[in-house]
Swiss-Prot record:
Function description: The glycine cleavage system catalyzes the degradation of glycine. The P protein binds the alpha-amino group of glycine through its pyridoxal phosphate cofactor; CO(2) is released and the remaining methylamine moiety is then transferred to the lipoamide cofactor of the H protein.
GO cellular component terms, semicolon-separated: cytosol; glycine cleavage complex
EC number: 1.4.4.2
Statement: the UniProt record of this protein carries the keyword Aminoacyl-tRNA synthetase: no
CC cofactor: pyridoxal 5'-phosphate
Record-linked NCBIfam families: gcvP (TIGR00461), PRK04366.1 (NF003346)
Coiled coil (residue ranges): none
GO molecular function: glycine binding; glycine dehydrogenase (decarboxylating) activity; pyridoxal phosphate binding
Protein name from the UniProt record: Glycine dehydrogenase (decarboxylating)
């Protein structure tokens, strides 16, 4: 690969000689021949991408450093949901910047995910303890989205018979914006004030409100209880360390952002939000829940619980469309709480509250009117006609305060605030700080202890904390250990050079509402990225706001909805979705107010064009959209894609292109050229943002020219229809994708796509003699992934797809995608980053497993006692004094005999009991007093 600059060769796994060998195995003379066979000619892009020439790692880092150097990092006192933090270096280095943590996938395979599951379990425990509510999910996308999701829970609780939502206090403007976006298609009536009626599903109580004030909500809460409405608290989790838990004053749900638990502002994200609920709401809560169960030998083990709630199973009836959440940031927040412990957290909160109280007292002594009497960290001051002037003076001193209106400013303190800041800020109002540590929260203090669990008291030295995080990471299998061949997930390299800028001061420490002239680096970087993504996809405009692929789907469908409404066709509400679609598609369509009509697929996996045409024509007067994944979820380039788009357009609909499989298209074909009107791009798949063990992700959307006016807006930009709290969503991790594209260039991106297609076809070729490859396209080719039909083992030996998945752990692999999109099969996606050696190792393992299944079929091993049925095998099980199995210990843990003991991955638990875990749901660690 000498014709490319160094990074391209570093990113792509197969060497030239490997490429030649794989092509030879396929009987092909060249890569060009493979692409000609695999990718339909009518969709191919017959020109090079018009992108800047590739740079080396050093040059790209230097260029991005210059760009982000245009940002002016000043100390923020803006607040409004975003706060300065001190990220403990032990957490930054050993968790946030550690590939063992950030390259892991969502922990669906629990046996190889015990480390991050344990820390997410502690996150849930932390949230439950702070809020006083028994059940918490393992993060949502941001605070604004979490409020909207909680409202959705309330409406589902009332079986959609109530639709009125009462905002009982002043929420942050971006939260109201997101709630209003969510409300319109779902028919929610958003009201303000204190009037609770019989149609009120929930009241939303800020704790404190956007002005920093703790209001008196006793009467409206009592009225809500009397009327059967649920109470949702929007609560600051740092304040909750010293303030009364929401459950104590009647909250049924609590939501908020965990950003100030050690996670930088990052110009808006990513940050983990929390949601906690009463026990009665457990089964309708959105997001993933970590539960505690046991393994086959009775050892405690963690797993994702109640998965039947999720969209890949419930589809348009799911509790939410959220798939990727913010697991990495939730783990950071949990680690922050473990590092500081309850006393440390309270010390931080008390100091912040004292600074705010002293500032408030100083202003009052100087005759300045402030809002409210009960405060935590924020003081809102009335300064008639002087807001801009005071903010400008603060800016000159290197501090940013919030301009609420021409007559009002807000000042928010955080853990980075100092005595010097207090004095300087007070002087802007002609005031001097007064002494004392009085906190203005009379009668609202936390009266009970919290976080008594041992884990929050055991890691005070850095040595202990470092080893704790290492022990957790060692339990897991991430990309730093082995290939993760998950179909439809694109687990490719997250290069160090791409990741490094995320920690830069000029990237991490800007408030999303900082003045525009101080964030010119972000403006340039995001402008570059939007232009590059437009060129890659062929679209006219891009929004970077959606902070997950599911949010991208929602944003794209909402753009279609608003387009139809603007043309006087708001009645268009039918969304055609193939039966093969990912579950987020119908879930997102439902959230966008659309009714789902399923389009059948043919036995060969392709969409049934006759069924599509019939249903499009049947619903032509009300057709809103058609959602299609391409290549298909079956891993095939369907020849009829352009015809599908024409049918939909001819019947008045718009084509939504799910970009989950964009890794098979970049540089070879463009969604807009194919006929799509809108497409979301998973930057955490195709464009190298890591999965983080279940988030963060970024799901920007590209749209055709006629849809550009309907891209998500933001209240800070003077526009509407935001789908996320910050204008650029998870802005700080956009630099990862910027670096990837800048170092690859157009030719490198195309080469990566070709390598991904080659790797998948090579795997299909090697395995097809042992397992049927379920779907192929023209010339018997697949796209970038293939479905391996392991049901042949079930038929011959009773070996299930789960047995195969768990046995792969003994071979040192994360299993491919299991039982999706076809039950009983495995879908394999190698990506371009895996070298031939690792690909061959996976193929060898799959072939060896088929050989093991044959021994079961032949009666050599019993059906109920064999290495597959008992997989995975732990070290403790293997070292047990008694070994009663009909296979040897070596066959159990070093299958095939050729596996290097020095590279052995040992799962910490054997197969986890999923059914028992759901029947006996435990999703937080009980307080120590419980054991008394």
């Amino acid at each position: 690969m000498t014709e490319f600059l160094p990074f391209v060769a570093r990113h792509i796994g197969p060497r030239h000689e490997d490429e030649r060998a794989m092509l030879a195995a396929l009987g092909l003379p060249s890569m060009e021949t493979l692409i000609t066979q695999a990718v339909p000619a009518p969709i191919r892009l017959n020109r090079a991408l018009n992108l800047p020439a590739a740079l080396s790692e050093a040059d790209a880092l230097a260029e991005l450093g210059t760009i982000m150097g245009r940002n002016v990092v000043k100390k923020s006192f803006i607040g409004a949901g975003y706060h300065g933090v001190h990220t403990p270096p032990v957490i930054q280095r050993n968790l946030f910047e550690n590939p063992a943590w950030y390259t892991a996938y969502t922990p669906y395979q629990s046996e190889i995910s015990q480390g991050r599951l344990e820390l997410l379990f502690h996150f849930q425990t932390l949230v439950a303890e702070l809020t006083g509510l028994p059940v918490a999910c393992a993060s949502l996308l941001d605070e604004a989205t979490a409020v909207a999701e909680a409202i959705g829970v309330a409406c589902r609780h009332h079986r959609d018979k109530r639709s009125r939502i009462l905002l009982a206090g002043e929420l942050h403007p971006q939260t109201v914006d997101v709630v209003n976006t969510r409300a319109e298609p779902l028919g929610w009536e958003i009201a303000t004030g204190s009037d609770v009626d019989d149609n009120t599903a929930a009241i939303v109580v800020p704790w404190p409100d956007t002005r920093g004030v703790y209001g008196d909500f006793a009467k409206v809460i009592a009225d809500a209880k009397a009327k059967g409405a649920l109470v949702i608290a929007v609560a600051d989790p740092l304040a909750l360390t010293i303030m009364e838990a929401p459950a104590r004053w009647g909250a049924d749900m609590a939501v908020g952002s965990m950003q100030r638990y050690g996670v930088p502002m990052g110009f808006g994200g990513p940050h983990a939000a929390y949601l906690a609920v009463s026990e009665a709401l457990t089964r309708i809560i959105p997001g993933r829940i970590v539960g505690q169960s046991v393994d086959a030998h009775g050892r405690a083990a963690y797993r994702l619980a109640l998965q039947t709630r999720e969209q890949h199973i419930r589809r348009d009836k799911a509790t939410s469309n959220i798939c990727t959440a913010q697991a990495l940031l939730a783990n950071m927040a949990a680690a922050f709480a473990i590092w500081h412990g309850p006393a440390g957290l309270q010390a931080i909160a008390t100091r912040v509250a004292a600074l705010a109280a002293r500032f408030a007292a100083a202003l009052k002594a100087a005759g300045v009117e402030i809002a409210g009497e009960s405060l935590f960290d924020t003081v809102t001051a009335k300064v008639p006609g002087k807001a801009a002037a005071i903010a400008a003076e603060a800016d000159k001193g290197g501090r940013l305060i919030r301009i609420i209106d021409a007559d009002t400013v807000g000042v928010t303190f955080d853990e980075t605030s100092t005595e010097e800041d207090l004095t300087a800020l007070a002087s802007l109002f002609g005031a001097k700080p007064v002494g004392g540590d009085t906190v203005l929260v009379p009668g609202k203090e936390r009266g009970e202890g919290f976080l008594t669990q041992e884990v929050f008291h055991s890691h005070r030295s850095e040595t202990e904390m470092m080893r704790f995080l290492r022990r957790l990471a060692d339990k897991d299998l991430a990309l730093d250990r082995a290939m993760i061949p998950l179909g439809s997930c694109t687990m490719k390299l997250n290069a160090a050079a791409e990741m490094m800028p995320v920690s830069w001061n000029t990237v991490a420490n800007l408030h999303p509402f900082a003045p525009a002239e101080q964030v010119q680096g972000y403006a340039k970087m995001t402008s570059d990225l939007e232009a590059w993504l437009c060129e890659i996809t062929g679209f006219a405009g891009v929004s970077l706001q959606p902070n997950a692929g599911s949010q991208g789907e929602y944003a794209g469908l909402m753009a279609i909805r608003h387009y139809h409404q603007a043309r006087g066709q708001g009645h268009r509400n039918i969304c055609l979705i193939p039966s093969s679609a990912h579950g987020t598609n119908p879930a997102s369509a439902s959230m966008a107010g659309m009714s789902v009509v399923v389009v059948n697929c043919r036995p060969d996996g392709d969409i049934d064009i006759d069924d599509l045409k019939a249903k499009a024509e049947k619903h032509r007067d009300n057709l809103a959209a058609f959602m299609i994944t391409y290549p298909s979820t079956y891993g095939v380039f369907e020849e009829g894609i352009k015809a599908f788009c024409e049918i939909v357009h001819d019947n008045g609909g718009q084509v939504y292109f799910d970009g989950a499989n964009l890794n098979a298209l970049v540089g070879l074909a463009r969604p807009a050229d194919i006929g799509a009107d809108v497409c979301h791009m998973n930057l955490h798949k195709t464009f190298c943002i890591p999965h983080g063990g279940g988030g963060p992700g970024v799901g920007p959307i590209g749209v055709a020219k006629h849809l550009v006016p309907y891209l998500p807006g933001h209240v800070e930009a003077g526009s509407e229809h935001a789908v996320a709290a910050a204008q650029f969503g998870s802005a700080s991790i956009l630099v990862i994708t910027w670096m990837y594209i800048r170092m690859m260039g157009g030719a490198g991106l195309k080469k990566a796509t070709e390598a991904a297609i080659l790797n998948a076809n090579y795997i299909a070729h090697r395995l097809k003699g042992v397992y049927p490859i379920l779907y192929t396209g023209a010339h018997d080719r697949v796209a970038h992934e293939c479905i391996v039909d392991t049901r042949v083992l079930k038929d011959s030996a009773g070996i299930t797809v789960e047995d195969v998945a768990k046995r792969l752990i003994d071979y040192g692999f994360h299993a491919p995608t299991m039982s999706w999109p076809v039950a009983g099969t495995l879908m394999i996606e190698p990506t371009e980053s895996e070298p031939k050696l690792e690909i061959d190792r996976l193929c060898d393992a799959m072939i060896a497993i088929a050989g093991e299944a044959k021994k079961v079929a032949d009666g050599v091993w019993p059906a109920d006692d064999n290495p597959l049925a008992n997989a995975p095998h732990t070290a403790s099980d293997t070292l047990a004094t008694e070994w009663k199995h009909p296979y040897t210990r070596e066959e159990a843990v070093f299958p095939g005999g050729a596996f290097d003991p020095t590279a052995k991955y040992w799962p910490p638990v054997s197969r986890v009991d999923n059914v028992g875990g759901d029947r006996n749901l435990i999703c937080s660690c009980p307080p120590v007093a419980t054991y008394g």
